Curated annotation (Swiss-Prot):
Protein name according to UniProt: 4-hydroxy-3-methylbut-2-en-1-yl diphosphate synthase (flavodoxin)
Keywords associated with the record: 4Fe-4S, Iron, Iron-sulfur, Isoprene biosynthesis, Metal-binding, Oxidoreductase
Pathway info: Isoprenoid biosynthesis; isopentenyl diphosphate biosynthesis via DXP pathway; isopentenyl diphosphate from 1-deoxy-D-xylulose 5-phosphate: step 5/6
Stored HAMAP family: IspG
Reaction(s) the record says it catalyses: (2E)-4-hydroxy-3-methylbut-2-enyl diphosphate + oxidized [flavodoxin] + H2O + 2 H(+) = 2-C-methyl-D-erythritol 2,4-cyclic diphosphate + reduced [flavodoxin]
Family per record: Belongs to the IspG family.
Note on how the cofactor is bound: Binds 1 [4Fe-4S] cluster.
GO biological process: isopentenyl diphosphate biosynthetic process, methylerythritol 4-phosphate pathway; terpenoid biosynthetic process
Any one GO molecular function term: 4-hydroxy-3-methylbut-2-enyl-diphosphate synthase activity (flavodoxin)
Sites where the protein binds [4Fe-4S] cluster: C300, C303, C346, E353
Organism: Methylobacillus flagellatus (strain ATCC 51484 / DSM 6875 / VKM B-1610 / KT)
Its EC number(s): 1.17.7.3
Co-factor requirement: [4Fe-4S] cluster
Domain of life (superkingdom): Bacteria
Length: 428
């Protein structure tokens, strides 16, 4: 499915560096580093890994003078590596000072994330918020007004709770919290416009950690503004719980046409790559038919007919192989991200699923003849057997990609002009 065939709420388009965000552009995948930004080498390495995995925007923490002092160098090192991913500065508490004191940082970032709940307190709050917006104006940068229910403006909370208590029909506590989030986002976006920031340089978000609350907040928010919306379930958690929670929330909203950029906020397992959040975000969009990022492998779950684990191992190897190739294939073979591959475990559904894919292999189940027919574009082409089935099948996949997606290939796609492109990689 082309992204334009999905019904989306109409929004302005905001440019984050070379990446457009809004209803006229594809839903954008972004991620965030967990390195100390003051450690430029570690941050460059992780940003590069996230970008190579397919992240189209990467957010970095800018929380100290030491971190701010390294942002310009980080940007230049990434550029030297051929990595043009836009960097977003995540500011809390002291962003007004850091942007003023480190102009190299302010210039190098493609967007500033501002949390209205901790930009300042009391009389200093408006002054410090204004300073950050003026920096965005001076450096011609967009901002994200990012409200989080864990860090709402305490003065605003107290005022709204007092007002609610005096209503004839007070809102329930959860409904009041959702309204606080929405009002904070919209009021601060309006304040940014009053200070002179154009409306097409504003993205907003309202983050919560409960699925149903996120859905309700964004449905309401989406009906009350035309700013692009950043979607994400904050503190989603670890492992399958985090994946399921984010998928449940984001899928409902995306199906409603709400959401212009997404991040899946997973807590990594010890030693786990940060890139998993990028893969999950891509797979949410791809399984919904909204965008394509990498060829996905169809594989049966296995049953009593598939006592061998070989088909599972082959499916895993092929999926990893395809994803590993995508940083190069994405630019070399446009359209390959739409390719489908089937790795099936027995004769029941194997031939049928294999015929429906661009390339499919039907491995023998328990008691079946130990051969594996391969189907290309619905036609049986060869039968594999022996110890080299995996290697031989990989060669068939490589040849199919080369023939069909190279220059002049029948499945090759021309660029979409969205700015979401991959440029040649350098070693790191």
């Amino acid at each position: 499915m082309d992204h334009q065939s999905l019904s989306r709420r109409t929004t302005k388009t905001v440019m984050i560096g070379h990446v457009p965000v809004g209803s006229s552009a594809p839903v954008v995948v972004q991620s965030m580093t967990n390195t100390d930004t003051a450690d430029a080498a570690a941050t460059v390495r992780q940003v590069y890994e996230l970008w190579r995995a397919g992240s189209e925007i990467v957010r970095i923490t800018v929380n100290s003078p030491e971190a701010a002092a390294q942002v310009g160098a980080i940007r230049r090192q990434l550029d030297d590596l051929g990595c043009n991913v836009p960097l977003v500065g995540d500011f809390h508490f002291n962003g007004h000072r850091l942007l003023a004191q480190y102009p190299d940082c302010a210039e190098a970032l493609a967007k500033y994330r501002i949390n209205p709940g901790n930009v300042g307190k009391g009389s200093k709050r408006d002054e410090q918020f204004s300073a950050m917006i003026k920096a965005a104006i001076d450096y011609n940068k967009p901002v994200r007004i990012g409200v989080n229910w864990g860090s709402l403006d305490q003065a605003k909370m107290a005022r709204m709770m007092d007002e609610n208590s005096k209503r004839a029909a007070p809102l329930a506590a959860d409904a009041l919290m959702r309204e606080m989030l929405i009002q904070s986002a919209l009021e601060n976006a309006a304040a940014a416009e009053e200070l002179g920031l154009p409306s097409d340089r504003i993205i907003i978000s309202c983050k919560v950690s409960a699925v149903q609350d996120l859905i309700k907040v964004y449905r309401d928010l989406g009906s009350r503004c035309d700013y692009p919306l950043h979607l994400g379930l904050t503190e989603a958690g670890m492992g399958s719980k985090g994946i399921v929670a984010s998928t449940a929330a984001l899928s409902v909203l995306l199906q409603d046409g709400i959401g212009d950029t997404i991040r899946v906020s997973l807590t990594p397992e010890p030693g786990e790559s940060r890139t998993k959040e990028v893969v999950v975000a891509q797979e949410i969009l791809q399984t919904m038919g909204i965008r394509s990022f990498t060829p996905l492998v169809t594989a049966c779950p296995g049953c009593g007919r598939t006592t061998s684990t070989f088909f599972q191992e082959l499916a895993q190897k092929i999926q990893h192989y395809l994803r590993d190739q995508m940083p190069v294939w994405r630019s070399q073979y446009p359209g390959v991200e739409n390719m489908s591959v089937a790795v099936m475990g027995c004769v029941v559904n194997g031939p049928g699923e294999s015929k429906l894919a661009n390339i499919g292999i039907s491995l023998p189940g328990t008691g079946e003849v130990p051969v594996a027919p391969v189907y290309v574009d619905g036609e049986k082409t060869v039968t594999l057997k022996g110890e080299r089935i995996a290697d031989d099948f990989k060669v068939i996949v490589e040849e199919y990609v080369r023939v069909n997606y190279a220059e002049g290939g029948r499945l090759r796609q021309q660029g979409t002009g969205t700015g979401l492109k991959t440029i040649p990689l350098k070693a790191i």
